[in-house]
Amino acid sequence: MADGDYFAEAARAVGCPHAPVPGLGLGPPLGWKERLKAGLANSGSTLWFLAGLGLLYALRVPLRLCDNVTAVTGFLSSLTPKFYVALTGTSSLISGLIFIFEWWYFHKHGTSFIEQVSISHLRPLMGGTESSISEPGSPANSRESETLRHHHLSECKVWRNPLNLFRGAEYRRYTWVTGKEPLTYYDMNLSAQDHQTFFTCETDFLRPSDTVMQKAWRERNPPARIKAAYQALELNNDCATAYVLLAEEEATTIVDAERLFKQALRAGEIIYRRSQQCQHQSPQHEAQLRRDTNVLVYIKRRLAMCARKLGRIREAVKIMRDLMKEFPPLTMLNIHENLLESLLELQAYADVQAVLAKYDDISLPKSAAICYTAALLKTRTVSDKFSPETAFRKGLSTAEINAVEAIHRAVEFNPHVPKYLLEMKSLILPPEHILKRGDSEAIAYAFFHLQHWKRIEGALNLLQCTWEGTFRMIPYPLEKGHLFYPYPSCTETADRELLPTFHHVSVYPKKELPFFIHFTAGLCSSTAMLAFLTHQFPEVMGVFAKAVSMISRTCVEYL
C-alpha cells in the first residue's frame, strides 16, 4: 500500500472537515427521532430484563415462590456429600472438555467457537441487528462496502517473490535431504497461473511446440511437465519456454540451470526479433510480442540470479541494470529488489542509496526489502559506536534518531522481520509468492538479507534495542497506522496458505485469548476444587451448602 494514498486521504480529510470520513460511516447529525429510535434499540435488552423482574415480583404469590424455595431447600438439605462430589466432578469434567475444545478451535481458526456461534446463530434469534442505520440497498452503504472490499483485496494481494529459488536445484534438493515439502499446493498453483500468463498467448495454436508447452504449464505432475518440455523441443529445437521449464524443474544444480537458461536465451532472442518485425500486422502479433518479451525478460533475470548464486556478482548487477534500462515498463517484476541484494553483497552502499532514492518514493508501493534496506543504510552510519548505556545517559544524536526512526518505519511496515534477523525464529526456504507485510515476506527478506545485517558491526544490536518501540507508537495496529495504512487483518490466513505446515506462522498483533476460554478454565478449576473439598471435608462442605441455600431462601423471601 503506497504512502501516497495515505497522505492523499489525509489531505482530503483536512481539506473537507465537514465531509464524511470514508470507511467510518460518519454522516450528517441525526434528528431527535432517529436518536430516540437508536437509544430504544440499544436499551432493548435492559428493558426486557427489568420487565422480567417486575413480572416475577408480581407473580410471586400466585406461583407460591416461597413455598417452592422451601421445598427445594429441604431437598438440598437431605442430599448426601457423595451427591455433591459426583455433581461437582461431572461439572468439572464437562467444563474441562469444553475448555480443551475451545483452546483447540482457537489455535486452529483464531476465534472462539462459542463466541462465533453466539454471533452467527443466537444473536439473530434474540433480535440483534447491525449497527449501521443505512438501508442495505442504499447508495451510501453500497459505496462504502465497495470501498472496503477494494481495500481488503488490495491488502491481501499476493506478489511473486522476486528472489524465488529454483525448484529443481534448490527446493527439490531440500526435499531430498529433509523429506519435507517446502512449497504448498496453493503456492505452486499461483506459479502455474503466472507461467500461463507470462509464457502463453492466444496465438500458441500457430506453433505446435507452443501448444504442447501450453498444456505443460497446466500440468500438475512435475515428471509430466518435463516430458512435455522434451516433446516441445522435438517439435521445435528453438522453443525457449521448454528450456525454461527444464532449467527450473529438471536441473539439479545451478550450473545445469544456467546452461539451460543460456540455450533458452539464444532461442528467445531469435523469437523476440522475429516478433518485433511483425508486431504491427495485427493485434494477435502484438500479443505474441508481449509474450516473447516476458519470456526474454524472465530468462535474463534468471541468468542474473544464476550468476549471483555462482559468485559472479558484478555480472549479475550488469544484467539487472541492462534489464531495467531496456524494459522500464516491467517495474512490477521488482527487479530492483534483486539489484539491491546484489549491490549489498558488493558492499556498494552508494549505489544502494541511489537505487533507494528512485524506488523508495512516496507514490510507489513499498516492500520489506526497500524499508529495511533504508533502515540498514542509516543504521550503518551509527551502529559501530552505538551503546544503550550512553544513549540512556546522554540521549541520542541526530544520526541515531534518524536510524531509530528508519527502524521504526520498517518494523511498522513488516513487524515479523526482526524476529528472523535477530534469530529469535528459525528460517525456512522462502515461498515462490509472498504477501506484503506478512510472515511470508519476512521470511523471503531475512533469508537473503540476514548476512548483510551481520556484516555491519552493531547493526543487529541497534535493531534489538529499538525495534519493539514501534509497538508503543502504534498501540492498536489494526485500527490505525503511523506511517502506513493500519496493519491488514488478512495476513495470517494468506500466510498459512503460502507457508508449509511445519512452519509456525508469525501472527501480528498477538491475539488475546477469548473470554470463553478464560471462563471455561475458571469454571473447570472451581468445580474441580469444590469436588476435591467435598470429598476431603464432607461435613464442612455440607454446612457450607446449607448456609448458601439458607441465604438464597432469605433473599427470595425478602423480595
From Swiss-Prot:
CDD domains: ST7. It comes from the Eukaryota. GO terms for biological process: negative regulation of cell growth. Coiled coil: none annotated. Pfam families: ST7. It is found in: Membrane. It is a multi-pass membrane protein. This is Suppressor of tumorigenicity 7 protein-like. It comes from Mus musculus (Mouse).
